[in-house]
Amino acid sequence: MKTFALRSTIASVGIATLLAFAPASFAATETYTAELKSASEVPPVDGKGSGMLTATYDTATKKLTYSVTFKDLSGPPAAAHFHGPADAKSNAGVVVPVKEMTASPLKGEATLTDAQAADLAAGKWYFNVHTANNKGGEIRGQVMKK
């Protein structure tokens, strides 16, 4: 009888431990990138600017963390945003604005809704950087899972 009680206690503790850590075991970090080019704007922009977005999305915390480097813009960045949902040939509204405009690199983070995370994972977001000379956007790239 003591052996049964001991085994039951050990099994209960084991199951409780597994359940306590189960959500963390299903979490994942996803990596995203976008190559930013003037030719990718809709409509295309005649410019020499280019850049690269790298981002990670933590599925447990729903936090998107990003860094954007850019060079050869026609002027300083005036604004930058994640837009969606849209394919590479369409425009869409802002879903995540960059809060602090600085020189390259731009860095930030945002907490996404489930719908935003689904659009991001489906490749329906793009990122672009705006300047005074190109108010609609000077460089753009479709954000894709790596």
Predicted regions and their residues:
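Metal-centered catalytic cores of metalloenzymes
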Residues: 2-6, 14-18, 22-80, 84-146
